[in-house]
């Protein structure tokens, strides 16, 4: 008989990806609209992916 496994949470799978070292990569918030007041430098930094903190990584790896 096959083992029961936890299903992948599709909402989490669409938002996070796992790096080679097991860390979680995510996109920055505050990118969609109302960016006129932000400087070009701030918007450029938001374009890059962010690495999730280790405490959150433990919680979200179970969802993936």
From Swiss-Prot:
Q: Which GO terms describe its cellular component?
A: cytosolic large ribosomal subunit
- Name recorded for this polypeptide: Large ribosomal subunit protein bL35
Q: Which UniProt keywords apply?
A: Ribonucleoprotein, Ribosomal protein
Q: PROSITE patterns from the entry?
A: RIBOSOMAL_L35
Q: Which residues form a coiled coil?
A: none
Q: Which family does it belong to?
A: Belongs to the bacterial ribosomal protein bL35 family.
Organism expressing this protein natively: Ureaplasma urealyticum serovar 10 (strain ATCC 33699 / Western)
Q: Which GO terms describe its molecular function?
A: structural constituent of ribosome
Q: Name a single GO biological process.
A: translation
What PANTHER family is this protein classified in?
54S RIBOSOMAL PROTEIN BL35M (PTHR33343), LARGE RIBOSOMAL SUBUNIT PROTEIN BL35M (PTHR33343:SF1)
Q: Which domain of life is it from?
A: Bacteria
Pfam families per record: Ribosomal_L35p
């Amino acid at each position: 008989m096959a083992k029961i496994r936890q299903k992948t949470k599709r909402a989490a799978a669409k938002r996070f990806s796992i790096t080679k070292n097991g860390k979680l990569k995510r996109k920055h918030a505050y990118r969609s609209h109302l960016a006129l007041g932000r400087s070009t430098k701030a918007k450029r930094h938001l374009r890059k992916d962010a690495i999730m903190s280790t405490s959150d990584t433990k919680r979200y790896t179970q969802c993936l």
